[in-house]
A protein has these predicted regions:
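Internal glycine-rich alpha/beta core junctions
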Residues: 9-163
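Short, conserved phosphate-binding/catalytic loop or strand-edge motifs used
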Residues: 1-8
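Glycine-rich cofactor/substrate-binding loops
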Residues: 129-297
């Protein structure tokens, strides 16, 4: 795992994907909600009084169309409903951008833990027009770019909510662009992301290799907490582990060796105890329970 772009503690790649899965489930729930909110119709006359159009006509027409009559309107259905729809699309697009940024980040040459599909039928087969060796994450970059457009459109939908009196048509010209464009763009990036995730290559060897890049520094918190359990003040334990970490990084010495030769740590942890602390499985002990809670196992 990484936080602030820096190695944090071990986790499984499956947990990362499960996090995305749960977020997508929330989007599906939101779509169901907004369908209910937005599936309304109205035929209520120039200012919403029904003076020239009886309510019964509105109810009959809406029923035929599978809509609910809006309880009250002026000349139009209020644009908070439209804005809500586009906000939900923007949320979906932004999640796909978030997932895509992660894929792009993990595809970088020096990380190379996953790769989006490349060279297969229906996928990109040219990374760079001038550098033949490149496999650029073009599909996920495209998702990120289009997501920005959908978010911008959702802001325009908010701008369409305040209108003069019982209606003006300043919203109309914008809606002719932002509503169809947002749905088309969302459909495109959803399908593109499905293609990416379905054909994505996972490089397990590089994941393990990168896990060991820091020479064991990823176990720092576990060692610190073990010292605290031995009665060392947390502040003192933190400073000792931080000092050992800096020495390991600056001198290129394996973190475990630095720990074993630190006087304060040696007083509290013997070599066998230190060895047992450098265990990646410790960090994964609740993974199965998390998946069960997500109903994925």
């Amino acid at each position: 795992g990484r936080s602030h772009g820096i190695h944090a503690e071990p986790m499984s790649f499956g947990l990362k994907i499960a996090l995305w899965h749960e977020e997508i489930k929330r989007h599906i729930e939101r779509v169901d909600q907004v369908i209910n909110i937005s599936s309304v119709g109205m035929i209520s006359g120039p200012v919403g009084t029904h003076a020239t159009v009886p309510i019964e006509i509105e109810e009959t027409v809406c029923k035929e169309l599978g809509l609910k009559p809006a309880p009250i309107t002026n000349q139009i259905i209020q644009r908070d409903r439209h804005a809500d729809v586009l906000q939900r699309l923007a949320l979906i697009a932004t999640s796909l951008e978030k997932f895509s940024i992660e894929i792009r980040s993990l595809q970088r040459t020096e990380i190379n833990e996953i790769q989006e599909p490349f060279g297969k039928p229906g996928f990109v087969s040219t990374g760079s027009s001038s550098m033949p060796h490149k496999r650029n994450p073009e599909l996920t970059e495209r998702i990120c770019g289009i997501s920005r457009v959908i978010r911008s459109n959702s802001y325009a939908a908010l701008e369409n909510m305040p209108l003069w009196n019982e209606r003006d048509i300043s919203h109309s010209s914008a809606e002719r662009i932002i509503i169809p464009d947002s749905f088309l763009a969302a459909d495109y990036i959803i399908n593109t992301f499905y293609k990416v995730i379905s054909g994505m290559k996972v490089n397990e060897e590089n994941m393990l290799k990168n896990l060991n890049l820091t020479g064991g520094l990823i176990f720092s918190e576990k060692i610190m907490l073990s010292l605290v359990e031995k009665g060392v003040q947390r502040k003192d334990a933190y400073e000792a582990i931080q000092s050992a970490s800096i020495e390991s990084m600056d001198k290129g010495i394996d973190f475990k060796d630095v720990i074993k030769n630190n006087d304060m740590i040696k007083k509290n942890l013997n070599d066998l105890e230190v060895e047992l602390l450098f265990d990646t499985e410790y960090f994964l002990k609740y993974v199965d329970q998390i998946f069960k809670r997500l109903e994925l196992s």
